[in-house]
């Protein structure tokens, strides 16, 4: 969704990242305008957010009607590059990354912003601090904003896209949580569990095939399985996922597989009511 350059803010004397939208001469005027508007939407979405694990937008400048987003410069690789160069991470590191991304997603969702493209390539790891930074809100959906995607088209990364969105349903924050589950699998094993040889194969894997998290996910398997629940109403929520990951980080023990409240209200076991005689006689049989 663009090319990112390392640059220098000459006025303030600081390093910045500049995201440029590649010029496509084949686009119609309408499509070119849509692409420009999408870039501006990304900047506006980021401008609403303030969180240590979300990239900071400094400015937007235009040159010959081409927008450039001036961003915080993160000196470090993407999670995708780190996996390629150094191999998968262990469960403790995956849990740390997951906790930080859950914080970022919670801040975005509270502000009415859905990322919709959470994947290893869009997560940066700062050198020296290992700070986790969520970036690239290019296809984010902002509450109250008009969608810029044409009817029937799809933008995003299928291997990390929730099944409800694949099927064309309108999605909420739960879609980003599914993406996080797939991302954790990739971080732990080096490959998405939904990778296939064709787009049709990926679609079938996400929507139909049995979901098989990698063996490396074992220590945090309940979290991964909860995030990769196909029914968004039953999917593990961000607060509980974070608590489970923090518990694992603190104790080293695998979190409980069925945390309280995971089931939606209509599926929770009914509470047993005391017999009428117990209420009327103070607990003594008549």
Where are these regions (language model features)?
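Activation-segment/catalytic-loop signature of the eukaryotic protein kinase fold
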Residues: 60
């Amino acid at each position: 969704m663009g090319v990112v350059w390392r640059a220098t803010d000459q006025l303030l004397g600081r390093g910045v990242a500049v995201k440029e939208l590649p010029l496509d001469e084949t686009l119609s005027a309408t499509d070119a305008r849509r692409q420009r508007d999408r870039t501006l939407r990304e900047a506006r979405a980021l401008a609403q957010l303030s969180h240590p694990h979300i990239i900071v937008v400094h400015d937007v400048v235009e040159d010959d009607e081409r927008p450039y987003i001036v961003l915080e410069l993160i000196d470090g690789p993407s999670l995708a590059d780190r996996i390629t160069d150094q191999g998968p991470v262990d469960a403790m590191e995956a849990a740390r990354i997951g906790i930080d991304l859950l914080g970022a997603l919670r801040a975005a969702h509270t502000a009415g912003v859905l990322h919709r493209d959470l994947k290893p390539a869009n997560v940066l790891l700062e050198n020296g601090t290992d700070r986790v930074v969520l970036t690239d809100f290019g296809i984010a959906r902002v509450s109250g904003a008009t969608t810029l995607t044409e009817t029937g088209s799809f933008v995003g990364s299928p291997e990390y896209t929730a099944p409800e969105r694949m099927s064309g349903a309108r999605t909420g924050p739960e879609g980003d949580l599914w993406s996080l589950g797939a991302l954790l699998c990739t971080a732990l094993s080096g490959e998405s569990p939904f990778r296939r040889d064709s787009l049709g194969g990926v679609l079938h894997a996400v929507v139909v095939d049995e979901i098989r998290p990698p063996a490396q996910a074992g220590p945090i398997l309940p979290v991964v399985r909860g995030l990769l629940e196909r029914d968004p109403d039953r999917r593990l929520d961000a607060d509980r996922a974070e608590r489970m990951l923090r518990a694992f980080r603190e104790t080293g023990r695998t979190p409980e597989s069925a945390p309280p409240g995971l089931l939606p209200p209509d599926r929770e076991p009914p509470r047993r009511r005391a017999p009428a005689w117990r209420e009327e006689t103070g607990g003594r049989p008549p």
